[in-house]
Amino acid sequence: PEKPNFRPNVNFVPGPAVDYVCDLNEKFPFADGEFEGIFSAYLIEHMRMLRLKGFLSECYRVVQPESYVFFITANLYEQCKKLADKAPGAWDEDDICMIFAGKPDEPGNYHHCGFSPEMAVRYFEEAGFREVKIFEHPNCVTDMIIQARRGLG
């Protein structure tokens, strides 16, 4: 089979690999079912929780029926377990950044929400996705990969 077309690269800030800059809190400037799939890495934890449902509904709208979406995001449950396992007073700057900021490499690069695997499944299912599966990131136990499929409807 052919590789799925995961272009264009859409972001809310310009960059060398960005094809479209748009406000991801608004309706996407794409037709219904325009894309064969979506791949997103470390984006949704930077969105406001109140806008996340609309964002996921837009992702559902722009992918073709039976298509898959893949999201890599922080696993807040595993992050909290990691912090809880540390001795009192042993937290450092990296621990705080893990929960609240990701990598503070630019202004506004903060986490506005977080997900346990169960919460992620619920949000994706509420947006209409089916077959929602959560995988541990192979290189980082405190991150997860969300795979979900759009149904025929």
Positions of PLM-derived features:
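Conserved SAM-binding loop
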Residues: 1-81, 146-151
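S-adenosyl-L-methionine-dependent methyltransferase catalytic module, highlighting the catalytic core
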Residues: 50-64, 68-153
